[in-house]
């Protein structure tokens, strides 16, 4: 762990200066239970190195988090006999990020758990309000994004 933000609760958890129910730890990543779970077993996976969000995440930390997420996902499926898993990751306040240390949410999912129905309703309302794009509109947006692609 090279970089720490001493005002960051997730850095404090990674340094064992704040309590957490840890489910997995590697040299560069940590997984612990969310204190506001949407489902039993809802787990957060973080890099131990402080990275604000996906925009700041370095390749080494990203690989460590995804490796840990795969291990924890398999454990969640086995521990809860889950039918599936939702992975959520938010960036910046407008994207729904509340703690500014990169983290991925892993939530075990079950048929008829109600969570997908709420998400599906919101998505359908958004689609109705916006409408589905034409193929030409999709190509225009894709070109706009491609113009800004930069390899690290």
Please give the residue ranges for each predicted region.
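HIT superfamily nucleotide-processing domains
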Residues: 1-152
């Amino acid at each position: 762990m090279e970089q720490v933000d001493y005002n960051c609760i997730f850095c404090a958890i990674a340094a064992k200066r704040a309590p957490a129910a840890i489910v997995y730890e590697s040299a560069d990543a940590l997984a612990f239970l969310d204190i506001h779970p949407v489902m039993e077993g809802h787990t957060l996976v973080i890099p131990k190195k402080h990275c604000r969000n996906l925009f700041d995440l370095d390749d080494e930390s990203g690989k460590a988090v995804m490796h840990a997420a795969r291990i924890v996902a398999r454990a969640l499926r086995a521990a809860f006999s889950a039918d599936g898993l939702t992975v959520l990751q938010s960036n910046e306040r407008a994207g729904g990020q509340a703690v500014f240390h990169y983290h991925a949410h892993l939530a075990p999912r079950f048929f008829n758990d109600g969570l997908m129905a709420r998400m599906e309703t919101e998505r359908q309302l958004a689609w109705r309000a916006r409408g589905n794009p034409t193929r030409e509109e999709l190509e225009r947006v894709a070109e706009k994004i491609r113009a800004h692609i930069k390899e690290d």
